Amino acid sequence: MAEAYLLEKLKSVEQTFHELTRRLGDPEVATNPTEFQEVAKARASLEETVNTFEDWKATQQELADAQQMAKDGDEDPELKEMAAMEAAELTEKLDGLETKLKVLLLPRDPNDEKNIMLEIRAGAGGDEASIWAGDLVRIYSKYAESQKWRVKLLSESGGEMGGFKEAILEIQGERVYSKLKYEAGVHRVQRVPATEASGRVHTSTATVAVMPEVDDVEIEIDPKDIEMSTARSGGAGGQNVNKVETAVDLVHKPTGIRIFCTEERSQLQNKERAMQILRAKLYEMELQEQQASVTSMRRSQVGTGARSEKIRTYNYKDNRATDHRLNQNFPLEKVLVGDIELILETCIAQDQQAQLADLAAAV
């Protein structure tokens, strides 16, 4: 690895990892569950980097030995040829490990570990846009289930012909934001709607916002800025239906954000949910403002994450989902059943390559 600064950084990571390992064996840490969990989590976040660095060092030594054997004129020609072939394989392996190490050393998005609120809003296209928003809810729900994540519908406003005018999902699990953050933006569908008698293709849109969950410490909300009213919840069965005002209609006066929450069983639970959604929305606004203010720095080549950015078109006639940031097509039938892993992995890879290019240019 030619870059000396990367070697120094890797040695520093290795040193920190060994120090954290030592602390896990410290009786004072072991008897403090909170501290033990924090240390264990910090150590786990470095483990892949340290293991890859160890593999790189071992491979580098193996390569040096193979190259020496290939150069040794006293050895058997057949043995020299085998050594040369091994050296070529080890060189390829070493290049792969170096690329992986560079990716592992990239700055991490502090939100990547967080759960999310995923908001889907029907855009242009009337009833068909609401139906499309409902399709997106199913796509993300199925993808989340395939990842063993937990999904819950927090808030909804149904469309007249089905689907949703607006829906908010809570998705919890391992590194949810790190993947689904790439889904923020405008999703356009081109198809013949079920409501279209003449068979004409319509274009409709829905907007996806991906909001990391935040607690009340990260986002403070002045109670005076909240205007709240209650309403009776509709629903199936139960003595409380249409008798007790459990639904909460919450307005944040400074921003005009309005949240209507009916999914929980009690008014208190719905209020807590509404505040949780509000914090996530305010935090997302902060993130958007921060990104908009960074004009001289690189913007992600897989998109800005802005709600107005058109990121993908779903064409039913051609059975094709086109990601405009990647300039690639993907099979629509897979996407519609929640199989979007390849798209997300490609987004992540392109984002990492862009960051690596910036890193190389800055050195």
Curated annotation (Swiss-Prot):
One of the Pfam families matching this protein, by short name: PCRF
UniProt KW keywords: Cytoplasm, Methylation, Protein biosynthesis
Modified residues (N5-methylglutamine): Q239
InterPro entries per UniProt: PCRF (IPR005139), Pep_chain_release_fac_I (IPR000352), Pep_chain_release_fac_I_sf (IPR045853), Prokaryotic/Mito_RF (IPR050057), RF-1 (IPR004373)
CC per GO annotation: cytoplasm
TM segment ranges: none
Protein biosynthesis keyword on record: yes
Modified how: Methylated by PrmC. Methylation increases the termination efficiency of RF1.
Superkingdom of origin: Bacteria
Compartment annotation: Cytoplasm
Coiled coil regions in record: none
Primary localisation category: cytoplasm
Statement: the UniProt record of this protein carries the keyword Protein biosynthesis: yes
GO molecular function, one term: translation release factor activity, codon specific
Gene3D superfamilies named in the record: 3.30.160.20, 3.30.70.1660, 6.10.140.1950
Function text: Peptide chain release factor 1 directs the termination of translation in response to the peptide chain termination codons UAG and UAA.
Similarity comment text for this entry: Belongs to the prokaryotic/mitochondrial release factor family.
Protein name listed in UniProt: Peptide chain release factor 1
GN (gene name): prfA
